[in-house]
A protein has these predicted regions:
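Extracellular receptor-binding modules and their adjoining Ser/Thr/Gly/Asp/Asn-rich linkers
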Residues: 1-3
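Terminal beta-strand-rich extracellular "head" domains
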Residues: 6-15, 28-125
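Local beta-strand/beta-hairpin segments that build beta-sheet-rich folds
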Residues: 19-23, 66
Length: 125
């Protein structure tokens, strides 16, 4: 079985802590002994800022942030902000009850992270 969610429109985030990515939430079913493979695909993000900008991406499971995260930063403060495709893949064991998976993101070093093309969250189990 597979589940899928996708963003629409332009989204931005300037928080230094993880906040939910609008539209990227799934509820995976119960199923002890099975692992769901969760993929967060952010194909064209970029970050703006004055101190080597970048972004971090992760997922929460029932509100708790997974320790597995993906991130990008530029090598220095760029004169123009290029796209940095970022993908996170994490295994989440199914439990005795359904679990909510929410994509989260944050800027690093005071930067603003922007996506203006669809990002997706999927689960296969």
């Amino acid at each position: 079985m597979a589940l899928y969610a996708q963003t629409a429109g332009t989204l931005s985030n300037n928080s230094g802590t993880f906040t939910p990515m609008q539209g990227l939430s799934l509820t995976i079913p119960e199923g002890v002994g099975t692992t769901a493979i969760i993929t967060l695909n952010v194909p064209n993000p970029y970050a703006t800022g004055n101190d080597i900008p970048g972004g971090m991406f992760g997922v929460t499971v029932n509100g708790k942030v997974s320790p597995v995260v993906a991130s990008f930063t530029y090598n220095d403060t760029p004169s123009s902000f290029g796209r940095v495709p970022t993908t996170l893949v994490v295994g989440i064991p199914l439990g005795n009850t359904a679990q909510t998976i929410q994509a989260v993101w944050a800027g690093v070093r005071g930067s603003t992270v922007i996506i203006d093309s669809p990002a997706s969250l999927s689960a296969v189990f």
